[in-house]
């Protein structure tokens, strides 16, 4: 039965269809301009950039320039890259310009599509950032598309690992900058740890287009970027705690895979208590006494490291280090570390060198970093399933862009087996059959371990020539994935390794040219060889098409439908045929943890025999339901985390804005005076409460505060004896004395040095207190959840207490800054005492009138070519004097020592 909603969609079309229809009309207007632009010479086409910029300077909007700018970029792409953006790419480009997310199928040309809004928005000169997931893609796209932008007179930079500040600053100053989300985020944090504007590398955040937007803004949303500094080395303690876990029995702990938690049972707690007591690390009577909080934290981390984290799935061991594996892409994430001691627990488990724990110096989540841009948009092959999250958190509307040619891929129903063993036997049979008929196969696995187990099975079965692509072989990723479309190729890949590189049937021309002709110079020979490679690829493509196109065979379903859709989407690009199928078992993680018991019972009733599969659309629907449940739970987690991070983010913005203001201030006298007066007011109100009797005054405490915070010795005891003196009078006298001392110091230092000192003290103190504040917020975050048991809202509690901590930090800042400024003194280093020659004197020879002492000095140093004999020196020409000792009489004849005469000007 058709619902009213379904009926309405049939008649009027979905909101997506209506939006696409409107944009298609605009795309047709741009296409109508194509003939005009084809008739322009290269010089006339290039002159369009200056013409558009002049129009913007006169007040025209980017929207009004869009048709002509898109037509210009399209024509330039045809001439420079040999590629013409289709109308659907124009539609996608408009979505990106209008702060949206363009969902385009794999192979539809997202990289080329992005050049249209990038060119248009770069005309403003405020900077456009194109964000990708790794350095390889950033460099590749900057080089390839950079030819188009350079042709149109725009500058292009690329931010990648290993650049120094000057190189980064130059790249950010370009009209268009390519870079990874990590590099951009860390540059922002590093900029906000600098002490001068000139040292900063980034410009204000204007416009960003995020490639693989779902991966960056959703999969990595929970991962904060953290710059940290090392704390004390506690590797012995981690190793000791680690020895307690392997001997534990199953009854000693409980693991909840769904919630990803591991906790000790009562029996387990008693066991580790005894072990700790024997090692001398148990304080008090019980493990859960307040003195053992840190020990409990380390024990829980060690338990999680052993029971929740799997080697070759969650991390790998490489070069004596634990390298985290991205659970969504299967890529290694070198440089990333788990926080709060978990990474050290994994290092202890795997017996590699334990790195010291780190203190957070600065941090930000991708959610909050990308929300700083004035304008944000993104593109991906799969975003529709997360449309609600993109809308709620980033205010981005997802639009599904129609394909240029109809999709010919056949998505087959899942095959479900009872056991993993049966499933793998079926997979190997299917791979053998497809391989023998010459069909290229992409096999998707969920972990390194599983990809290598499958590879071993294929070896045992005698299937040769397959490639394994996982985090271990990250360096060859692009080449392996690019050749996955060759007839008979079998490529085993973890999750979405290789995203960003197209799988083209017959092979990838660009990759083969790079690989096979790297040492062949430009010329007829190279052109001939490229033509031969093209012909070979065309022949191989025909074979692959005849075999049915690319076959995507997935060995397991992921928690997220989006990741499954990404894998499916590798097949059937640009109208090519293809097929996809998922092989599952009841022992798979998703089925075991989230699948309903009803499905298990249903399969048992059917009485499946060994190696027999069940295939039915109902199974697909039940699995999709389980995936939706997981997605909803993960969305709630991310949304909740963002609410907490927003509290810190508001404070971060205040602090970072304050730092920028300090950098720009040329005179901080008023700011410092205000801080000084606030410190004095707080001091007086604490020791002499308003309207309190004189007997209640703490004069001794006030005197001590004045000495410690203002470095002054004031006769407050005498003032207290005066008849009728009130707290305001104390306040005014202390302010007057402190202002006088500060003014005298400023006069001694001079305005330039004083401003430099004030700026340095304020910013260093602010940075140190902010770091401590981040630690305090982390501690508050870790315990505030327990307030829920007392029927109090943890988020509101966190907001209230975080604000109080922030207020305390600002009060401490005033005290620390004023205390340091009232004590600071400039110590000028005395110049070293000059070494006098052994015979200091003057002896004029009566016969010659020459200074015998000068001759003696010259004789003493005659091995030095720069020494000129006194008789050869012209008193009127310093160029003839050569090297002169500082304590010699000046050769000019003044009678003064050289250092007090001509030497003083050196």
Swiss-Prot record:
Pfam families: P-loop_SecA, SEC-C, SecA_DEAD, SecA_PP_bind, SecA_SW. It is found in: Cell inner membrane; Cytoplasm. Disulfide bonds: none annotated. InterPro entries: Helicase_ATP-bd (IPR014001), Helicase_C-like (IPR001650), P-loop_NTPase (IPR027417), SEC_C_motif (IPR004027), SecA (IPR000185), SecA_CS (IPR020937), SecA_DEAD (IPR011115), SecA_motor_DEAD (IPR014018). One of its GO terms (molecular function) is ATP binding. It is a peripheral membrane protein. It is an enzyme of class 7 (translocase). Its EC number is 7.4.2.8. Part of the Sec protein translocase complex. Interacts with the SecYEG preprotein conducting channel. Has a central role in coupling the hydrolysis of ATP to the transfer of proteins into and across the cell membrane, serving both as a receptor for the preprotein-SecB complex and as an ATP-driven molecular motor driving the stepwise translocation of polypeptide chains across the membrane. Monomer and homodimer. Part of the essential Sec protein translocation apparatus which comprises SecA, SecYEG and auxiliary proteins SecDF-YajC and YidC. PANTHER family: CHLOROPLAST PROTEIN-TRANSPORTING ATPASE (PTHR30612:SF0), SECA INNER MEMBRANE COMPONENT OF SEC PROTEIN SECRETION SYSTEM (PTHR30612). This is Protein translocase subunit SecA. It comes from Brucella melitensis biotype 1 (strain ATCC 23456 / CCUG 17765 / NCTC 10094 / 16M).
């Amino acid at each position: 039965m058709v619902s009213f909603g379904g009926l309405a969609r049939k008649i009027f079309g979905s909101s997506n269809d209506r939006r696409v229809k409107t944009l298609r009309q605009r795309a047709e207007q741009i296409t109508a301009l194509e003939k005009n632009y084809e008739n322009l010479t290269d010089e006339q086409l290039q002159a369009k950039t200056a013409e558009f910029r002049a129009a913007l300077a006169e007040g025209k909007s980017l929207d009004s320039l869009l048709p002509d700018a898109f037509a210009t970029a399209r024509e330039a792409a045809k001439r420079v890259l040999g590629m013409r953006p289709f109308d659907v790419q124009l539609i996608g480009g408009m979505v990106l310009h209008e702060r949206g997310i363009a969902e385009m199928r794999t192979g539809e040309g997202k990289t080329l599509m992005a050049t249209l809004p990038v060119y248009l928005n770069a005309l403003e000169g405020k900077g456009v950032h194109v964000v990708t997931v790794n350095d390889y893609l950033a460099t590749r796209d900057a080089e390839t598309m950079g030819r188009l932008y350079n042709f149109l007179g725009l500058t292009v930079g690329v931010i990648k690992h290993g650049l120094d500040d000057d190189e980064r600053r130059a790249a950010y100053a370009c009209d268009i900058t390519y870079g990874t989300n990590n590099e951009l985020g860390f540059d922002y944090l590093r900029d906000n740890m600098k002490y001068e504007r000139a040292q900063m590398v980034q410009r204000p955040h204007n416009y960003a287009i995020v490639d693989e937007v779902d991966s960056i803004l959703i999969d990595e949303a929970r991962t904060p970027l953290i710059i940290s500094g090392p704390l004390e080395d506690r590797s012995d303690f981690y190793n000791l705690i680690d020895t307690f876990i392997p001997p534990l029995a199953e009854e000693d702990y409980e693991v909840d895979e769904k919630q990803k938690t591991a906790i000790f049972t009562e029996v387990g707690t008693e066991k580790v208590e005894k072990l700790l007591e024997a090692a001398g690390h148990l304080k008090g009577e019980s493990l859960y006494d307040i003195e053992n909080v840190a020990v409990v934290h380390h024990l829980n981390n060690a338990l999680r490291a052993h029971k929740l984290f799997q080697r070759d799935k969650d991390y790998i061991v490489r070069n004596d280090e634990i390298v985290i594996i991205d659970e969504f892409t299967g890529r290694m994430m070198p440089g990333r570390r788990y926080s709060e001691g978990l990474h050290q627990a994994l290092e202890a488990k795997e017996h590699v060198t334990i790195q010291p724990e780190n203190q957070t110096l600065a941090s930000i989540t991708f959610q909050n970093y990308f929300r700083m841009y004035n304008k944000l948009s993104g593109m991906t092959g799969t975003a529709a399933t997360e449309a609600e999250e993109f809308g709620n958190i980033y205010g981005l509307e997802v639009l599904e862009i129609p394909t240029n040619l109809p999709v010919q891929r056949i998505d087959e129903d899942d095959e479900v087996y009872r056991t993993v063993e049966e499933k793998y036997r079926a997979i190997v049979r299917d791979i053998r059959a497809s391989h023998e008929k010459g069909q290229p196969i992409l096999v998707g696995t969920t972990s390194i371990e599983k990809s290598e187990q499958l590879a071993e099975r294929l070896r045992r079965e005698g299937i040769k020539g397959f490639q394994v692509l996982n985090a271990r072989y990250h360096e060859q990723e692009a080449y392996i994935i690019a050749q996955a479309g060759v007839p008979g190729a079998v490529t085993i890949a973890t999750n979405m390794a290789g995203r960003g590189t197209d799988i083209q049937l017959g092979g990838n021309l660009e990759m083969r040219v790079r690989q096979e002709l790297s040492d062949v110079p430009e010329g007829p020979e190279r052109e001939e060889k490229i033509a031969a490679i093209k012909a070979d690829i065309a022949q191989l493509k025909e074979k692959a098409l005849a075999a049915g196109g690319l076959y995507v065979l997935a060995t397991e379903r992921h928690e997220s439908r989006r990741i499954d859709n990404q894998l499916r989407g590798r097949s059937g690009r640009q109208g090519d045929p293809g097929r996809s199928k998922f092989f599952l078992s009841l022992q798979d993680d998703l089925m075991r943890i989230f699948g309903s018991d009803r499905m298990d019972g249903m399969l048992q009733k059917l009485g499946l025999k060994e190696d027999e599969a069940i295939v039915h659309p109902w199974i697909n629907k039940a699995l999709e339901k389980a995936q939706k449940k997981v997605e909803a739970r993960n969305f709630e987690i991310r949304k909740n985390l963002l609410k907490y991070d927003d509290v810190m983010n508001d404070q971060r913005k205040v602090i970072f804005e304050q730092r920028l203001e300090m950098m720009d201030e040329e005179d901080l006298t008023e700011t410092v005076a205000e801080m000084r007066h606030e410190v004095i007011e707080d001091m007086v109100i604490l020791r002499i409460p308003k309207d309190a009797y004189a007997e209640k005054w703490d004069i001794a405490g006030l005197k001590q505060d004045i000495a410690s915070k203002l470095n002054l010795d004031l006769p407050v005891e005498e003032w207290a004896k005066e008849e009728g003196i009130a707290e305001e009078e104390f306040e005014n006298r202390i302010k007057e004395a402190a202002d006088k001392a500060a003014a005298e110091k400023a006069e001694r230092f001079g305005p330039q040095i004083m401003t430099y000192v004030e700026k340095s003290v304020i910013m260093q103190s602010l940075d140190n207190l902010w770091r401590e504040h981040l630690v305090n917020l982390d501690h508050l975050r870790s315990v505030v959840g327990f307030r829920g048991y007392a029927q109090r809202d943890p988020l509101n509690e966190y907001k209230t207490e975080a604000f109080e901590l922030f207020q305390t930090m600002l009060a401490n800042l005033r005290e620390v800054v004023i205390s340091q400024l009232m004590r600071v003194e400039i110590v000028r280093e005395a110049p070293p005492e000059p070494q006098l020659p052994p015979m200091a004197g003057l002896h004029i020879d009566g016969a010659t009138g020459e200074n015998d002492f000068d001759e003696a000095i010259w004789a003493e140093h005659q091995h030095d070519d720069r020494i000129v004999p006194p008789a050869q020196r012209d008193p009127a020409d310093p160029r003839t004097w050569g090297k002169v000792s500082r304590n010699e009489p000046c050769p000019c004849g003044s009678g003064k020592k050289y250092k007090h005469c001509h030497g003083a000007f050196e």
